[in-house]
From Swiss-Prot:
InterPro entries xref list: FA_synthesis (IPR003664), Phospholipid_synth_PlsX-like (IPR012281)
Protein name per UniProt: Phosphate acyltransferase
Subunit structure: Homodimer. Probably interacts with PlsY.
Listed GO biological process terms: fatty acid biosynthetic process; phospholipid biosynthetic process
Amino acid sequence: MVKLFKQETTTVGVEADVTSSRGCPAAAQAPDVSGALISGVPVSAPLVLSIDAMGGDRGPAAVLDGIALARRKYPDLHFLVHGPEADVAPLVKARRLKSCVTIRHATGVVTMHDKPAAVMRGGKDTSMWSTIDAVRDGAAQVAVSCGNTGALMAVSMLRLRKMPGVNRPAIAAFWPCKNPSGFNIMLDMGADVKAEARDLLTYALMGSSYARNALGLDRPRVGLLNVGTEEHKGHAELKIAAEMIGAMETAGGYEFVGFVEGNDLPGSRVDVIVTDGFTGNVALKTGEGTAKFAGELMREAFTSSLLSKLGALLASGALKRLKAKIDPRRVNGGVFLGLNGTVIKSHGGADATGVAAAIDLAARLAGLGFAERLAARVALASANGQDAASAEAGIENAK
């Protein structure tokens, strides 16, 4: 199911604005977080996405296949594709993408084994660096890469710099749950293993902004991940963070539900789950591993006998819906929040479907001018209680 795609309100208590920050009609639908491509959805034009063709486990062919798949939904979207021209050009030609792709030649490739520090020192000739620079220079609105997460974050921070008021950027990702949209948002998923109370407050502000734009929620429910829901549980930094997030509830435009536990992640209690990068990444990998294990058990159970195979055939429709719900390819795309530009990290092993899902998310966030809206929301934290909605209204008026 695809929900209506809303933007953040421009005035507290007033209905959401119907124009995007680019002065064009807002996209009519929410990000297709299920990953299933639907027929053409209008997006503010012109939009250009910067795509790293290299670095993924499946090579540039999977990335170009993803672009071809995404183009069915966004025929007017243009792509800056970065990588060795000798490798990329034949793939573009074979998929008949010349009209929508401009190749940016970059000889170097960041591998999954490269250390972030090494890439920062000597990675200027890489496709990843070139991809981020396109956003930095204003040639594209959003960058997408399947490459090394640590290196991508390091290069993004170096080239785009952090937003004023952000100490530690975060990676936000969709998490399947029982909410009406089918997903909530969790951050940080591994950008930084540490997070102080002020950082967790910033994550709450950024996460709620992302939920408003990505899930169409007027007042997202924010929870702080802890070992229990009782106020006395957790370490001192978490308790301080809870007080700070609760105090900013009204001005931040979200509802703070307090502490949440791990079993709330797939539930319906919250829309935004805030935690440090260490905990978030462990939760992410645990969830992925559990989903894979459950799938293997189901496959084994439904193929163990003739009767079970018949049962699988009768339940094929329900099984396909379940697979689509938990398929990580269809919710592919972790967003780097807190930088002066939008960067989406696709899963390293993403196939065409996964890459297309990341591009879908990138196109929709670009169409909303999400980076500007997020910057205004983050300004709330550094301004010590300044009304974020007024800040966003100022951006709209300036445009």
